[in-house]
A protein has these predicted regions:
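Primarily a LysM-type cell-wall glycan-binding module
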Residues: 252-284, 305, 332-333
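Non-catalytic surface loops within mature trypsin-like serine protease
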Residues: 236, 268, 313-315
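An acidic, Gly/Ser/Thr/Pro-rich helix-cap/linker signature
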Residues: 2-3, 9-116
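Short conserved micro-motifs at the rims of enzyme active sites and ligand-binding pockets
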Residues: 243-244, 276, 320-324
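Hydrophobic alpha-helix feature that most strongly marks membrane-spanning transmembrane helices
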Residues: 237, 278-281, 285, 292-295
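Extracellular LysM carbohydrate-binding repeats and other cell-envelope/extracellular binding modules
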Residues: 286-330
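Catalytic glycan-binding domains that act on GlcNAc-containing polysaccharides
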Residues: 71-255, 294-300
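Generic alpha-helical secondary-structure signal
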Residues: 175, 196, 279, 287-290
Length: 333
């Protein structure tokens, strides 16, 4: 026998329609707020923990080595923009270079000044080596200034298995000054010198003649050299305005320049440098860090040449943030 459904178990059609409408409205709202209310990250006074990506500032013009560079032209602006983005967001290496500069610029800047080389050329050294005095390229270039063996010898450096003065900060810098002067005599301006340092003077001269270009920035070059000139300028821009690009350091964050305790003049062979180091109150590792041009555990000197070996001040090697000062005030807050 058929029976009709009870009114208590059946809802009118309009009630079902209302329930469906409310579910369609409320469920997305609930899901959308699952992570909390949409309020500004700093509304409660705490700093935002989310990364913030902003486009780095690109100046309209720069002065590099006393030569004005106009960056308002779109292609030059974009090339500079690329390198500033790379340095800004490749921040690990940029931060390390800023820290290391406090150790090496006190040695390098006075030499550039004495040799008559514009101070801005130190940034060429920064991008060549990231301020690691023993760094070696796959092609065999070595040291802060990345000399190839033949070029190093041509500029007066001793380069062999026992001694590699490309890693001697002072001697390599003076050799770099000689080489930069030679390039400037050939090129006539410092931006072309930078391009020639990377690609070789013959190649740049040939392209300048073929392309009938008066400015190295207007040359059609391989990407590495084309970027190289802007990397040097971008490095200068960030080193002179670090906070503008998000680098906030205190003086205690910088790596200090540690003057040697003494300098020992050597004119004979030293068969055992580890013993020599111990006799002078330091470890062999500390001796090599102070004299990275020494390549082995002995110093061979059959010709009686004069070498000056720096003896590190082991007491000064202890980290003391109160003793670290910034070589350039613009690096720190």
């Amino acid at each position: 026998m058929e029976t009709s459904p009870s009114p208590r178990h059946s809802a009118p059609w309009w009630a079902l329609l209302i329930v469906g409408f409310l579910c369609g409205l409320l469920i997305p709202m609930a899901c959308g707020n699952a992570s909390g209310p949409t309020v500004p990250a700093e509304a409660d006074g705490t700093p935002s923990q989310q990364p913030q990506w902003t486009a780095p500032y690109v100046p309209a013009e720069m002065v590099f080595a006393d030569e004005k560079v106009d960056l308002r032209r779109s292609d030059l602006h974009e090339r500079m923009d690329r390198e500033l983005i790379t340095f800004t967001y490749g921040h690990t290496l940029t931060m390390l270079m800023l820290k290391r500069a406090n150790r090496f610029f006190p040695i390098v800047e006075p030499i550039l000044r004495e040799e008559g080389i514009p101070d801005d050329l130190k940034y060429l050294m920064v991008i060549e080596s990231n301020l690691v005095p023993t760094i070696k390229s796959p092609a065999g270039a070595m040291g802060l200034w990345q000399f190839m063996p033949a070029t190093g010898r041509e500029m007066g450096l001793e380069v062999n298995a026992n001694i590699d003065e490309r890693c001697h900060v002072e001697k390599a810098t003076r050799a770099a000054c000689r080489y930069l002067r030679k390039l400037h005599a050939q090129c006539g301006d410092w931006m072309t010198v930078c391009a020639s340092y990377n690609a070789g003077p013959a190649g740049i001269a040939s392209r300048s003649q073929t392309q009938k270009a008066d400015n190295a920035l207007d040359l059609l070059l391989v990407e590495e050299t084309s970027r190289y000139m802007f990397r040097v300028m971008a490095c200068k821009q960030i080193f002179e305005h670090p906070r503008l690009y998000g680098f906030h350091l205190a003086a205690s964050d910088l790596y200090p320049y540690i003057a040697p305790a003494e300098t020992v003049t050597v004119t004979a062979t030293i068969d055992d440098l580890p013993t020599f180091a111990r006799d002078h109150g330091c470890s062999f590792a500390q001796l090599i860090e102070a004299n990275p041009w020494l390549r082995e555990t002995s110093l061979q000197n059959k010709s009686g040449r004069t070498y000056k070996i720096l003896i590190p001040d082991t007491a000064a090697l202890n980290y003391d943030p109160t003793r670290t000062s910034a070589y350039h005030r613009e690096w720190v807050e």
